[in-house]
Design a protein with these regions (language model features):
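Conserved donor-binding/catalytic core segment of Leloir-type glycosyltransferases
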Residues: 22, 52-71, 76-80, 90-91
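Short alpha-helical segment that forms part of, or immediately flanks, the ligand-binding pocket
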Residues: 124, 147-157, 168-171
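Donor nucleotide-sugar binding/catalytic pocket of nucleotide-sugar-dependent glycosyltransferases
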Residues: 3-51
Length: 180
């Protein structure tokens, strides 16, 4: 963490000498003091992948991403546990500090299936099979103004309905394609 802070300070010290910017969110303009320097807003890059269309599985909710309390994995599992329908299934793919929490939840509730780290091509197939994709990250922390979750772009490209919180860094143009 100490080295990360040093690196961050070093990067910020170089910002005044930057002549143009590619930004993830509109809020970065102020944070980086862009001023009148040229800038381009580019939320992310998506490399289209040709996936054979998958048959939808009934009542399958999918989360792919970092397993961390800050990104809402515990909230997702708690909310899923409140669903009183044995036909619902929650698939979780990823790795992180809350891996053990997820594994324990899967042991307690057989409807929760933890896949671990999954190859990207298989993740795309799972996203097409799922009934609903979910990003449980909340927008109350400051960093969410300056980030755009790559999973949002992946989820939208899959064509599967996506539910998530309205994050500050999410452009208004995306809202009609998401359940917020």
């Amino acid at each position: 963490r100490f080295l990360g802070n040093l690196e961050t300070k070093r990067i910020y010290s170089l910002v005044p000498s930057v002549d143009s910017f590619v930004l993830l969110t509109k809020y970065m303009r102020e944070k980086l003091n862009v001023g009148l320097r040229p800038s381009l807003l580019l939320e992310g890059i998506y490399n289209p992948v040709c996936i054979v269309p998958q048959k939808k599985r009934k009542k399958t909710i999918l989360y792919t991403g970092k397993l961390d309390i800050r990104f809402g994995i515990r909230d997702l599992i708690k909310a899923f546990n409140d669903i009183d329908d044995s036909e619902f299934v929650l698939w979780i793919c990823g790795f992180g500090l809350d891996r053990i929490f997820v594994e324990e939840a899967a042991k307690k509730d057989k409807r929760i299936i933890y896949w671990g780290v999954v190859e990207q091509k298989h993740v795309f197939e799972m996203q097409q099979q799922a009934t609903l994709l979910v990003n449980p990250r909340k927008g109350h922390e400051e960093y969410t103004k300056y980030s755009f979750p790559s999973k949002t772009m992946e989820y939208m490209a899959s064509g599967t309905p996506t539910i998530m919180y309205k994050l500050p860094g999410l452009p208004i143009e995306y809202e009609e394609y998401l359940v917020l």
